[in-house]
């Protein structure tokens, strides 16, 4: 059970149910005991009235029926008595042919006694002395109507308690939902962080959530600062190595080295491998994958300037176009996507005759990037080799052969894949599929 609201509801239901049942049963028990004490007083008065009804007769003591309560005369009326003397016993006519169990102790009997017609009797026994003779008077009253009333009250109480419990649970559910609303706001803000619509969470949060919000904002700032330092360090490393490598390349091309062609060729190959390996590893090290807050890739903002730059580099004869859904923002790091698309478009421009086309589409939980050119293309059996580190099929084309490899590394860092296909333009199509499940849905501006 992971839902906080469900846990609170179940816990509150259990507590209220137990407390309600205990309170209800305790209340009924206390009320029952109070009623029994009240009836005990009435039964004592009845016993004393019966004692007064014992008068002297011709043959000794006798019961004056004129003084009896009429209920003692009706059969099974619920009011009974038994008077015991040493030699005589008087029973109320209401007992008819039934017997009344005489308790062994005087006073109110603990519990109820079985009576006629399945009645439950409250019984009182008193010891008295009249006219020099000892008497034992047992008086009983039917307690069944009281028990039936208690049962009705219990069922009514259970019904009312159930309704009250449901009402309390409903109010508690509304209260908890309202209390947890700040968490929903934090969740929405985190989703906005993923979509690049904000750089940090709002500091105005409930007191209980302030430490969490502060830690998340601190983590975001620390992550962004760490990434900036890492990128700066990698950039500095790349610049620092360029000069020594340029010196070594220059030395390899000197006339002195031309006199030793084998050594010169080995030196060239090793230097080129160093440049390839350095460029690829630096490119892999700086990958971010999912974007930092506020660093998403806005297609409408980034792609026009990227295409204009490529036209300036490769000449006005080349038509570089792009298409994307209006307002589409991709939930990956801006620098990573710029580098990936820059490499793919630059590679396409080098091989294209007159046209390069970039298509961005979204659907089925994926973002698809397609770069098409009208160049010579690549044979299917050679496409895997092109994706290998630093491989170039034509040494006449400038570059170190790193573009497709770096683009594939970036695609994999974003959880996607890169593939080579035939282009409708007649050349090569480089297709990149990036899943939205890992980074959240692409945002529309």
Curated annotation (Swiss-Prot):
UniProt-listed Gene3D superfamilies: 1.10.287.130, Histidine kinase-like ATPase, C-terminal domain
Source domain of life: Bacteria
Keywords: ATP-binding, Kinase, Membrane, Nucleotide-binding, Phosphoprotein, Signal, Transferase, Transmembrane, Transmembrane helix, Two-component regulatory system
InterPro entries xref list: HAMP_dom (IPR003660), HATPase_C_sf (IPR036890), His_kinase_dom (IPR005467), HisK_dim/P_sf (IPR036097), Sig_transdc_His_kin-like_C (IPR004358), TCS_sensor_his_kinase (IPR050428)
Annotated EC: 2.7.13.3
Annotated ranges, domain Histidine kinase: 236-438
Residues that span the membrane, as ranges: 150-170
GO cellular component annotations of the record: plasma membrane
PTM-bearing positions, type Phosphohistidine: 239
Pfam families from the UniProt entry: HATPase_c
One BP annotation, GO: phosphorelay signal transduction system
UniProt keyword annotation of ATP-binding present: yes
Primary subcellular site in the record, as a coarse category: membrane
Leader sequence segment: 1-24
Boundaries of every HAMP domain copy: 177-228
GO molecular function (one): ATP binding
Membrane topology listed for this record: Single-pass membrane protein
Broad class of enzyme this protein falls into: transferase
Location of the protein in the cell: Membrane
Catalysed transformations (reactions): ATP + protein L-histidine = ADP + protein N-phospho-L-histidine
PANTHER family the UniProt entry points to: SENSOR HISTIDINE KINASE TRCS, SENSOR HISTIDINE KINASE YKOH
Function of the protein: Member of the two-component regulatory system CarS/CarR that regulates the expression of multiple genes involved in calcium signaling and homeostasis including CarO and CarP. May function as a membrane-associated protein kinase that phosphorylates CarR in response to environmental signals leading to activation of specific gene promoters.
This protein's name: Sensor protein kinase CarS
Annotated gene: carS
């Amino acid at each position: 059970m992971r839902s906080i609201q469900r846990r609170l509801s179940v816990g509150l239901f259990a507590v209220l149910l137990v407390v309600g049942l205990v309170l209800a049963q305790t209340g009924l028990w206390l009320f029952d005991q109070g009623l029994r004490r009240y009836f005990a007083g009435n039964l004592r008065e009845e016993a004393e009235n019966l004692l007064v009804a014992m008068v002297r007769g011709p043959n000794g003591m006798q019961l004056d029926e004129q003084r009896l309560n009429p209920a003692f005369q009706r059969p099974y009326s619920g009011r009974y008595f038994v008077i015991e003397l040493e030699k005589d016993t008087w029973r109320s006519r209401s007992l008819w042919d039934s017997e009344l169990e005489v308790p062994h102790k005087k006073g109110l009997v603990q519990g109820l006694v079985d009576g006629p017609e399945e009645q439950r009797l409250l019984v009182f026994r008193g010891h008295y002395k009249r006219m020099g003779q000892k008497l034992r008077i047992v008086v009983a009253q039917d307690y069944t109507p009281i028990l039936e009333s208690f049962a009705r009250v219990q069922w009514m109480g259970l019904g009312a308690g159930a309704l009250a419990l449901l009402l309390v649970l409903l109010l508690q559910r509304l209260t908890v939902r309202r209390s947890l609303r700040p968490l929903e706001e934090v969740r929405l803000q985190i989703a906005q962080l993923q979509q690049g619509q904000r750089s940090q969470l709002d500091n105005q949060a409930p007191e209980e959530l302030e430490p969490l919000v502060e830690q998340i904002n601190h983590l975001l700032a620390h992550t962004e600062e760490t990434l900036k330092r890492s990128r700066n360090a990698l950039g500095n490393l790349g610049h620092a190595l360029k000069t020594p490598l340029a010196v070594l390349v220059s030395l390899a091309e000197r006339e002195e080295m031309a006199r030793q062609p084998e050594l010169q060729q080995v030196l060239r190959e090793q230097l080129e491998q160093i440049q390839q390996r350095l460029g690829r590893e630096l490119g892999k090290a700086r990958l971010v994958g999912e974007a930092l807050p506020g660093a998403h890739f806005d297609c409408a903002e980034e792609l026009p300037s990227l295409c204009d730059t490529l036209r300036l580099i490769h000449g006005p004869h080349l038509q570089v176009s792009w298409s994307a859904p209006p307002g589409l923002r991709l939930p990956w790091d801006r620098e990573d996507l710029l580098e990936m698309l820059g490499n793919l478009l630059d590679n396409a421009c080098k091989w294209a005759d007159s046209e390069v086309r970039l298509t961005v589409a979204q659907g089925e939980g994926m973002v698809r990037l397609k770069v098409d050119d009208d160049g010579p293309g690549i044979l299917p059996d050679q496409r895997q080799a092109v994706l290998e580190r630093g491989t170039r099929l034509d040494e006449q084309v400038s570059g170190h052969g790193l573009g497709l490899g770096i683009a594939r590394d970036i695609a994999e860092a974003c959880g996607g894949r890169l593939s080579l296909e035939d282009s409708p333009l007649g050349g090569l199509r480089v297709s990149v599929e990036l899943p939205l499940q890992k980074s959240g849905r692409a945002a529309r501006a």
